[in-house]
UniProtKB/Swiss-Prot annotation:
Start-end of C2H2-type zinc fingers: 76-98, 104-126, 132-154, 160-182, 188-210, 216-238, 244-266, 272-294, 300-322, 328-350, 356-378, 384-406, 412-434, 440-462, 468-490, 496-518, 524-546, 552-574, 580-602, 608-630, 636-658, 664-686, 692-714, 720-742, 748-770
Keyword Transferase: no
Family: Belongs to the krueppel C2H2-type zinc-finger protein family.
Gene Ontology molecular functions: DNA binding; zinc ion binding
Gene3D superfamilies: Classic Zinc Finger
Broad class of where this protein is predominantly found: nucleus
Expression (tissue specificity): Expressed in brain, heart, skeletal muscle, kidney and pancreas. Weakly expressed in aorta, liver and lung.
SMART domains recorded: ZnF_C2H2
Keywords annotated in UniProt: DNA-binding, Isopeptide bond, Metal-binding, Nucleus, Repeat, Transcription, Transcription regulation, Ubl conjugation, Zinc, Zinc-finger
Keyword Zinc-finger included in the entry's annotation: yes
Gene Ontology process terms (BP): regulation of transcription by RNA polymerase II
Protein name per UniProt: Zinc finger protein 107
One GO cellular component term: nucleus
Length: 783
């Protein structure tokens, strides 16, 4: 018995295709359902020419449905493509997609849709009706299908499996996207620039680059986005909510994609492999970066200057710089920007708004990326490890920057002076040296900075905020980086090693400074006198000698300094706090440099040797001063009397002769001194402390300098020779005193009678005649 043949519904909007095409097109689809029917048994009848002729259709939606249900089969054809539908509504919907007609418009935002169901779904964005709630985590959704997909996160269910490689996915769309990897097919081509994409959605996103359209706005912060997914991500960042937790280590993430990437660290999974070199990666973006290394990575070329970029967005930004197009203006200060995102970030400077708050410590940030970085301080997780040296980092970007130390790669070059950098951010900072731009101003003291981070750190001076505390000794710091460096004092860690001599340092800048010792290179020249320095910082300090500028003032007693480090040292002297303890004999010091110097004295180590005479020193600074004896160089000149000195400390001591200032007072006896070191030495008279002992004869001294002088008695060493008469001395100060005999110079003058002396000690003794002071008492009572 032959089955009853299918009959076409009388109600359809399209004309039937020619009869000769039935066998080729229609039969294939229809016979899936009616397999037993022969081609000749299919009876097709032509009904109304247009849907408007159908009385059932005019009767309303329900009448049409009844009519369609009554027919044995409901098959409708699309004119553009041979496609078969079992519902009249599906045929109409499909036709609208080809024509591009969008009759259904949203009253809220004017967005149009070609299908009513799409408009209905879209409306829920405005109404925020989240009817479907997840029982596992409480998260609500406005579509049931989204809830179903979400549940798979908790269950781990992945029903969609790739037949090619066996990889499974929790959504069919992910499987479809994945399959394209195997085919390498890129059917979706951009008509504007010719770039091809594997997915149509990627092409849609790409097109926005050309149009610049950003239809998705976040009402909370006013930020606009080109993609709805970016808006969703932004909302999550504002809430700070971390819903996705790693079962392996307990770390939580605000995005599921971040959790997926994180899991690969534990599993060691690296699914993204480079075909060029075979290197594998756990994140697709890292593979993209690697591929660009092989290709030269700069596919987007500027037609104006031939400069190439590895990202089209960078090319767009570059073009605006050439055109000097800056359409986004700040209404507050009038500054213009070539990107809207840059303007948005800039506005926060004026408002002081910090919407991103850390739940752990309450600290707030003006950018979500800063909050993300800050959170890692609390977790202390360092997932990214350097294969070269084993050092671990909490951010992948930090690891990439760290690797450049070994490769020596510096891809970012300054067009102004040619200097190259390994980070684009460092180049951006460097450029401000040429422009002199300092857009970040302190409201407290009007001081301006070229970087916002510098302003943030500066503000802590006014507030006194020190959020980073050392668990070892309790000392607090206003910067996390300073705390990290401080911790190395306790651990003794010295990660920066010199390849030339093997010497290790606890800070990178110390290693950089040290390397210059081997090269003997002096690139930084003083324009005033032509003197050259190995370090630019030394040249900067040297310049202050010529200008006499002292911008750093101590509020305690008004003393001014030419270096911030000197002011810091001064403050510590005022507090009298001794944080650094020498474990060998328990002595404490107020400065880390003092304990370091003390250790060298204790061990007797003298690593810095003079090539001229072979004399060795425990400090490099002492060697530098010593070398001036051979060269006769005296760069520090007194503005008052013109006398020159070979070290700044001697000049500072000399200046006090003219001012008569004695700011350092002994609490025990009230005696005042012009130098803090003299006060320290004086205090030992009261305590009787003599920590510096001679190994030769056992004699003890209250000052290390006295011990050094004493040792020369045993060695009979007299390295300081008078050029006038040939007499030798064991101390440089003794040679200076001796020289006065030849010059007849008497720089120390009595203010009472005008009598002059060649030694300050003689002037001090003379003054006691006027004051009647007799500080030295005989045990038997006579003074």
């Amino acid at each position: 018995m032959v089955a009853k043949p299918p009959v076409m519904s009388f109600h359809f909007a399209q004309d039937l295709w020619p009869e000769q095409n039935i066998k080729d097109s229609f039969q294939k689809v229809t016979l899936r359902r009616y397999g037993k029917c022969e081609y000749e048994n299919l009876q097709l009848r032509k009904g109304c020419k247009h849907v408007d002729e159908c009385t059932g259709h005019k009767g309303g939606h329900n009448t049409v449905n009844q009519c369609l249900t009554a027919t044995p089969s409901k098959i409708f054809q699309c004119n553009k493509y041979v496609k078969v539908f079992d519902k009249f509504s599906n045929s109409n919907r499909y036709k609208r997609r080809h024509t591009g007609n969008k009759h259904f418009k949203c009253k809220e935002c004017s967005k149009s849709f070609c299908v009513l169901s799409q408009l209905t779904q879209h409306r829920r964005i405005h109404t925020r009706v989240n009817s479907y709630k997840c029982e596992e985590c409480g998260k609500a959704f406005n579509w049931f299908s989204t809830l179903t997909k979400h549940k798979r996160i908790h269950t781990g269910e992945k029903p969609y499996k790739c037949e090619e490689c066996g990889k499974a996915f929790n959504q069919s769309s992910q499987l479809t996207r994945h399959k394209i990897i195997h085919t390498e097919e890129k059917p979706n081509k951009c008509e504007e620039c010719g770039k091809a994409f594997k997915q149509a959605s990627h092409l849609t996103i790409h097109k926005i680059i050309h149009t610049g359209e950003k239809p998705y706005k976040y009402e909370e912060c006013g930020k606009v986005f080109s993609q709805s997914s970016h808006l969703t991500t932004q909302k999550i960042l504002h809430t700070g909510e971390n819903l996705y937790k790693c079962k392996e280590c307990g770390k939580a993430f605000n995005l599921f994609s971040n959790l997926t990437n994180h899991k690969r660290i534990h599993a060691g999974e690296k699914p993204y492999k480079c075909k060029e070199c075979g290197r594998a990666f756990n994140i697709s973006s890292n593979l993209n970066k690697q591929e660009k290394i092989h290709t030269g990575g700069k596919l987007n070329k500027c037609e104006e200057c031939d400069k190439a970029f590895n990202r089209s967005l960078k090319l767009t930004a570059h073009k605006k710089i050439l055109m000097e197009e800056k359409p986004y203006k700040c209404e507050e200060c009038g500054k213009v920007f070539n990107q809207f995102s840059t303007l948005t970030r800039h506005k926060i400077i004026h408002t002081g708004e910090k919407p991103y708050k850390c739940k752990e410590c309450g600290k707030a940030f003006n950018q979500s990326s800063n909050l993300t970085e800050h959170k890692k301080i609390h977790t202390a997780e360092k997932s990214y490890k350097c294969e070269e040296c084993g050092k671990a980092f909490n951010q992948h970007s930090n690891l990439i920057n760290h690797r450049k130390i070994y490769s020596g790669e510096k891809p970012y070059k300054c067009e102004e002076c040619g200097k190259a950098f390994n980070r684009s951010s460092t180049l951006t900072r460097h450029k401000k040296i040429h422009t002199g731009e300092k857009p970040y101003k302190c409201e407290e003291c009007d001081r301006a900075f070229s970087q916002s981070s510098n302003l943030t750190e500066h503000k802590k001076i006014h507030t006194g905020e020190k959020p980073y505390k050392c668990e070892e000794c309790g000392k607090a710091f206003n910067r996390f980086s300073t705390l990290t460096k401080h911790k190395r004092i306790h651990t003794g860690e010295k990660p920066y090693k010199c390849e030339e001599c093997g010497k290790a340092f606890n800070q990178s800048y110390q290693l950089t400074r040290h390397k210059i010792v081997h090269t003997k290179e002096k690139l930084n020249k003083c324009e005033e006198f032509g003197k050259a320095f190995k370090q630019s910082s030394h040249r900067t300090i040297h310049k202050i000698i010529h200008t006499g500028e002292k911008p750093y003032k101590c509020e305690e007693h008004g003393k001014v300094f030419n270096q911030s480090s000197n002011l810091t040292t001064q403050k510590i002297i005022h507090t009298g706090e001794n944080l650094y303890k020498f474990e060998e004999h328990g002595k404490a010091f107020n400065l880390f440099s003092n304990i370091t110097n003390h250790k060298i004295i204790y061990t007797g180590e003298k690593p810095h040797k003079c090539e001229e005479c072979g004399k060795a020193y425990n400090r490099f600074s002492n060697l530098t001063i010593h070398k001036r004896i051979h060269t006769g160089e005296k760069p520090y000149q007194c503005a008052e009397c013109g006398k020159a000195f070979n070290c700044s400390s001697t000049l500072n001591r000399h200046k006090i002769i003219h001012t008569g200032e004695k700011p350092y007072k002994c609490k025990e006896c009230g005696k005042a001194f012009n130098l803090s070191s003299t006060l320290t030495a004086h205090k030992k008279i009261h305590t009787g402390e003599k920590p510096y002992k001679c190994e030769e004869c056992g004699k003890a001294f209250n000052q290390s300098s006295n011990l050094t002088t004493h040792k020369k008695i045993h060695t009979s060493e007299k390295p300081y020779k008078c050029e006038e008469c040939g007499k030798s001395f064991n101390q440089f100060s003794s040679l200076n005193i001796h020289k006065i005999i030849h010059t007849g110079e008497k720089p120390y003058k009595c203010g009472d009678y005008g009598r002059a002396f060649n030694l300050s000690s003689n002037l001090t003794t003379h003054k006691k005649i006027h004051t009647g002071e007799k500080p030295y008492k005989c045990e038997y009572g006579k003074t």
